[in-house]
């Protein structure tokens, strides 16, 4: 199998990629610093960040496939990244309570051997339940929201805050597996080799 490198420190992305290709990849964290760019819309921004992460990690390798991603939650015209404090998480959850939000992941797959690069985004509609202040406080105090875009983890306790989704569940977690699997197959990485 060709070398595959995940350009992410996210344990969730590592777990998701292993669902597709087993542990046949290495992790190399990008040193690219994400900064908001006012001239870009949210979709352009997450694609730009994922591309810059992939390019940064590619400098450390001679060959292989680099996979990078950037996920945000978008609500009422605002980008919600990862909350840095408990109070920030509380404010985010109060803001998204009872609303439909978008989980948007920019993803780049860079084949260093062929020069092919796919950079695109995947969106998933997420309908949040109306949360009471006690629910928000309890969830925030669990600590789970702190390193999650939009302050909720659909794959964890935050699942009870989500009424429904329309789109790729794994995109909300941080890596759109359906689209990623399709692109990897196109680049010669067989998802079903070990089946």
Swiss-Prot record:
GO terms for biological process: nucleotide metabolic process. The active site is at 70 (proton acceptor). Its cofactor is a divalent metal cation. InterPro entries: ITPase-like_fam, Maf-like. It comes from the Archaea. It is an enzyme of class 3 (hydrolase). Its EC number is 3.6.1.9. It is found in: Cytoplasm. GO terms for molecular function: dTTP diphosphatase activity; UTP diphosphatase activity. The keyword Hydrolase applies. Gene3D superfamilies: 3.90.950.10. It catalyses: dTTP + H2O = dTMP + diphosphate + H(+); UTP + H2O = UMP + diphosphate + H(+). Belongs to the Maf family. YhdE subfamily. This is dTTP/UTP pyrophosphatase. It comes from Methanococcoides burtonii (strain DSM 6242 / NBRC 107633 / OCM 468 / ACE-M).
């Amino acid at each position: 199998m060709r070398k595959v490198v995940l350009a992410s420190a996210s344990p969730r992305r590592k777990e998701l990629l292993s669902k597709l290709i087993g542990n046949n990849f290495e992790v190399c964290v990008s040193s690219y610093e994400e900064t908001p760019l006012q001239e870009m819309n949210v979709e352009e921004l997450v694609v730009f960040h994922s591309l810059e992460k992939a390019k940064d990690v590619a400098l450390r390798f001679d060959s292989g496939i680099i996979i990078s991603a950037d996920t945000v939650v978008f609500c009422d015209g605002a980008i919600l990244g990862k909350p840095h404090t408990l109070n920030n998480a509380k404010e985010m959850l109060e803001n998204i309570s009872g609303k439909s939000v978008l989980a948007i992941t920019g993803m780049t797959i860079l084949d260093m051997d062929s020069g092919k690069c796919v950079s695109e985004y995947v969106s998933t509609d997420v309908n949040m339940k109306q949360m009471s202040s006690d629910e928000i406080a309890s969830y925030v105090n669990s600590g789970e929201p702190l390193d999650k875009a939009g302050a909720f983890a659909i794959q964890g306790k935050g699942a009870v805050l989500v009424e429904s989704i329309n789109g790729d569940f794994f995109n909300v977690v941080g890596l759109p597996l359906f689209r990623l699997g399709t692109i990897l197959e196109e680049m010669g990485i067989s998802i079903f080799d070990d089946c």
